[in-house]
Amino acid sequence: MKDSLPAFEKAKVLVVGDVMLDRYWTGPTGRISPEAPVPVVRINQLEDRPGGAANVALNIATLGGQVSLAGIVGEDETAAALTTGIQALGVEPKWHVVADKPTITKLRVMSRSQQLIRLDFEEPYQQADSQALLDSAANSLADVDVVILSDYAKGALIEPLAFIQQAKSQGVKVLVDPKGSDFSKYRGATLLTPNLHEFELVAGAVTSEADLVEKAHKLLEEFDLEALLVTRSEQGMTLITAENKELHIPTVAREVHDVTGAGDTVISALATSLAAGSTMAEACAIANTAAGIVVAKLGTSTVSRIELIESLSDTHHSETGFGVVTEDQLMYALEQTRLRGERVVMTNGCFDILHAGHVSYLQEAQAQGDRLIVAVNDDDSVRRLKGDGRPVNPVGRRMAVLAGLASVDWVLPFSEDTPQRVIARLLPDLLVKGGDYKIEDIAGGKEVIAAGGLVKILCFEDGISTTKIIENIMANQ
């Protein structure tokens, strides 16, 4: 697969929010303390990882984007460790220092890949601290394409409305990872990325897909938002826009070890992609893939460009369902294919006994675009068209042979006499047919043309047909 990711190195992003340090103390445990019924952990590994808004910034830097980070820290050893950690990966710190408060720290004690306890070191920040941070961050708006507000309700983003309006007035997109049940503080933002629980806290319980979309549109209007991206764990994520467009993206996670920082990964990949020129739909697909990678890791983690490319390639070759597919599987595969900007070609036929003419025709069809769909008449459909004694090969075998050709990406059956319904649903960019047809007589052609696609006639190789092959076999018996 080609590297279809945008030029992340061109992305310029400012992250503003609650920064913290995630500390991991790890070691074996083999006995219970005589002082209390708790395990004794013999610590042999210490690790610091930037967390919260700092993890968002690290994700952007790891993807290759240019990123600066504005947050509140104390005047302490933890702040120094946090600064060292982000600068080492190319993140520019823009701290507001509050000397009488500790830098927020989450200390986790680990053993055998399990978290035994978490200790939090923090004190809430005041309105004056938050305002000073936002005023300082506003000075960087002219240098960026996208701003992320990473809200963990620790006090960095108490009243960000004026900052959002200032960013939007300068043409800067504002993405928000929200916290709590009050979305009014984010009014006017470009996009919010609540998880389903956060969404329901504001909109009420979701009873169906249609209900989710309806509730989302109400929030878009109420809070003057351009879009909502609702992350839904194993159900993937759903994008709803003020332009009445909805896109559901299924999850791509293979294994889930730790959801720590998954929301950070989603919004960082989304922002980096948008800043690099991706559409909203493209950026959401990339963010979904990034989230699937990070939940397979233990602890707060980042995702690299190489990991994204490899994961997108794996998804492209498996979960999008190459080979023999159902219509629903193919609809999702096409959604992902079009996000990558690939041209889809479609043809159809009985393909009862695959011969050299078929092979050359399918090769020519595939050469017209990037991906080729072959719709195949099922057995009853062939029988109605060709008469008793046909098909020679049942539909399962015919599709298996077609799917084995290098020129064919997807094969699916249809039961009608013509594939018009299937073509009208799939709407390829190019519909091709072999033989002496007129374009206006090709099933599904009108629907494809009406949708902005093309219809093309290709030539079959002379002197080769399934009927002649069958006649020759019968004559030689």
Curated annotation (Swiss-Prot):
UniProt-annotated catalytic positions: 264
Q: Which PROSITE patterns match?
A: PFKB_KINASES_1, PFKB_KINASES_2
Catalytic activity entry = D-glycero-beta-D-manno-heptose 7-phosphate + ATP = D-glycero-beta-D-manno-heptose 1,7-bisphosphate + ADP + H(+); D-glycero-beta-D-manno-heptose 1-phosphate + ATP + H(+) = ADP-D-glycero-beta-D-manno-heptose + diphosphate
Annotated residues for binding of ATP: 195-198
Give the matching InterPro entries: Bifunc_HldE (IPR023030), Carboh/pur_kinase_PfkB_CS (IPR002173), Cyt_trans-like (IPR004821), PfkB_dom (IPR011611), RfaE_dom_I (IPR011913), RfaE_dom_II (IPR011914), Ribokinase-like (IPR029056), Rossmann-like_a/b/a_fold (IPR014729)
Q: What is its EC number?
A: 2.7.1.167, 2.7.7.70
Similarity-based family: In the N-terminal section; belongs to the carbohydrate kinase PfkB family.
Subunit structure comment from the entry: Homodimer.
What is the name attached to this protein's record? Bifunctional protein HldE
Q: Which organism is it from?
A: Shewanella piezotolerans (strain WP3 / JCM 13877)
Query: Source taxonomy lineage?
Result: Bacteria, Pseudomonadati, Pseudomonadota, Gammaproteobacteria, Alteromonadales
Q: Which gene encodes it?
A: hldE
